Amino acid sequence: MSKFIEPSNEEIKLEKLYQDMGLSDKEYDKVVEILGREPNFTEVGIFSVMWSEHCSYKHSKPFLKQFPTTGEHVLMGPGEGAGVVDIGDNQAVVFKVESHNHPSAIEPYQGAATGVGGIIRDIVSIGARPINLLNSLRFGELTVKQNQRLLKGVVSGIGGYGNCIGIPTTAGEIEFDERYDGNPLVNAMCVGIIDHDMVQKGTAKGVGNSVIYVGLKTGRDGIHGATFASEELTEESESKRPSVQIGDPFVGKKLMEATLEAITFDELVGIQDMGAAGLTSSSSEMAAKGGSGLHLRLDQVPTREPGISPYEMMLSETQERMLLVVEKGTEQKFLDLFNKHELDSAVIGEVTDTDRFVLTYDDEVYADIPVQPLADEAPVYILEGEEKEYNTSKNDYSNIDVHDTFIKLLQHPTIASKHHLYEQYDQQVGANTIIKPGLQASVVRVEGTQKAIASTIDGEARYVFNQPYEGGKMVVAEAYRNLIAVGATPLAMTDCLNYGSPEKKEIYQQLIDSTKGMSEACKVLQTPVVSGNVSLYNETRGTSIFPTPVVGMVGLIEDVSYLKEFKPKAGDKIYLVGETRDDFGGSQLEKLLYGSVNHEFESIDLSDEVSKGKLIKQAIRNGIASHVQTVGKGGLLVTLAKISAHYDLGMQAQLDVTNAQLFSETQGRYIVVVKEGQTLDIDQAQEIGHLTHQQLFDISNSDVKIKENVSDIKQKWEGAIVQCLTTQD
């Protein structure tokens, strides 16, 4: 008789308890078909997390298959803990982005902290040493107190974990819109460096080889976290705080160092982080990839308290844990290593030739499941989409109050400086950060070399909402431009697809069209997708977030020497590269003046992005440019103001655009600051002004003149978020 009191197989079926775990009737029937019998409580739990949206991608898998995943530099693409891309000299960059949206909505500090911890372990499980962190965040408007609380908690959680573990946070983006009220997005990205011959895989093979557990003892925190992440947020979500894991960065640091030492042992067969779905996903996925069976003895699993059942052990998402497969007879070598690092560890099972996933506790069988169907036969749903109807009436932008609009945009939290938030992150730990958070992509030196890795993370949610296909192209191109702007060669990307419920036709269509656009951009820009994540059901009280695909992209700088002089000075000339058109659909201007976004915009020219990017990168590397900035949210006038305020330099410029076009967000444009005495020889480049010692921001077109003290602009731009966070309801 079992020592654990659980519902019987019959009770599970009759009372449909499997529905509470996230399985539909059809999915339960498929489990019965696979097993040839009714599943027990532990088996239902295992199938429910492995077949959850978060783990199986059952609504998004068809779209992921269209992404290009191979390329000249790709060493390892999707399917492992992170992507691996060659950077020369037998070295590679390892990177991935993951979401932790639902947990952060319920418990913002721990939700964000464990998101950072989890993505770090993904990189470490490949065998790479992390060199920097990035994040992409979305919140509701800061006029709402709850959104202020969420922002403060998330930023504190990111800083609290990253700072303690000793990895700099070097770049990111934060946007605010009421569509994220109660449903923030927290996407964390990590980048690491590895030698080619040290790359590890999450595989279990070699009959008789041992399975080793290492890290924090298993508790009851995070049970059904993967299922929770696959549901819409409701009034009842607050009761699911136990589904939010608790992070311990100090143990995380020990685990990271121990893992990086363990990968040097020839006897290591495979390794995987215990992330979403905990011990269930790590062990079953390793068995599936190795074409093997596994027998886990759960009475050997280190636990935080007595009485934890097999069901709870398998579904717990206790943080800071790794699972290893090592050669038989070498177990003590690994256990001694982990003991040296003051980590709990134990041999909990072995690889078998049965092709079955068997769990026992005190020799009693609690699960006996065929490996391949569990890992590979989750149902895939192809649904019907429905095109969104656009507002065909034209918005009127002919009578804009330029000065008032300029100040309002500059102070909107989406555009305003994030300095107050970034200063809570350690940006320099490790002493290899060359370009810190601010205006550009980050640049981190590869230690011991002249090389550096540039990285950026970007999203364009309003544009994807307006025109999903074009918006999908746009978000990839934006990341590409941000790497070009620091002189890097874009190599590859990772993505995080954040959407509402795919069961709603309009949202499913957004998923179809935006991923198609992203795929096309990846092919033209030659930035294959090597890793990623999908987060669906981002809805609160029936209201969906904007469709928010986020792109993390890395680029290579072979020699960082030019960056020593990559800083603008008074006397430098300012060029605008690219044409400015009447592009207002999806823009900050449309949102500011009309309260919503629902107008189409012009398509993006990807071939032009490539040719223009090559010329600008060449100008940077040849020492002609002292700063390059992509023209982004808020348009040309706002972009110029941000450069002036960031560098405390005066600026004088004459712009050949209309009043409304000062705020147009036409894609594919750059501001290139050229060193005094140099010229920019690019067809689409137009000299528009210069930087000055005078602390005046003096910009005009044929109709209006904006003349402000740089200090006033800086105060408005840098002080806006602080003011929002100190404003009481």
Swiss-Prot record:
InterPro entries with a match to the protein in the record: PRibForGlyAmidine_synth_PurL, PurL_linker, PurM-like_C_dom, PurM-like_C_sf, PurM-like_N, PurM-like_N_sf
Superkingdom assignment: Bacteria
Main location: cytoplasm
Protein residues bound to Mg(2+) 1: E98, N533
Keywords: ATP-binding, Cytoplasm, Ligase, Magnesium, Metal-binding, Nucleotide-binding, Purine biosynthesis
A molecular-function term among this protein's GO annotations: magnesium ion binding
EC number: 6.3.5.3
Annotated ATP binding sites: Y57, K96, D495, G532
SUPFAM superfamilies for this protein: PurM C-terminal domain-like, PurM N-terminal domain-like
Location(s), subcellular: Cytoplasm
Binding, substrate: S99, H100, N101, H102, R121, Q245, E317, T318, Q319, S535
Reactions accelerated catalytically: N(2)-formyl-N(1)-(5-phospho-beta-D-ribosyl)glycinamide + L-glutamine + ATP + H2O = 2-formamido-N(1)-(5-O-phospho-beta-D-ribosyl)acetamidine + L-glutamate + ADP + phosphate + H(+)
Residue numbers annotated as active site: H54, H100 (proton acceptor)
Known pathway: Purine metabolism; IMP biosynthesis via de novo pathway; 5-amino-1-(5-phospho-D-ribosyl)imidazole from N(2)-formyl-N(1)-(5-phospho-D-ribosyl)glycinamide: step 1/2
GO biological process: 'de novo' IMP biosynthetic process
Keyword Magnesium recorded: yes
Binding site for Mg(2+) 2: D122, D273
Family: Belongs to the FGAMS family.
Role played: Part of the phosphoribosylformylglycinamidine synthase complex involved in the purines biosynthetic pathway. Catalyzes the ATP-dependent conversion of formylglycinamide ribonucleotide (FGAR) and glutamine to yield formylglycinamidine ribonucleotide (FGAM) and glutamate. The FGAM synthase complex is composed of three subunits. PurQ produces an ammonia molecule by converting glutamine to glutamate. PurL transfers the ammonia molecule to FGAR to form FGAM in an ATP-dependent manner.
Quaternary data: Monomer. Part of the FGAM synthase complex composed of 1 PurL, 1 PurQ and 2 PurS subunits.
Name recorded for this polypeptide: Phosphoribosylformylglycinamidine synthase subunit PurL
Organism expressing this protein natively: Staphylococcus epidermidis (strain ATCC 12228 / FDA PCI 1200)
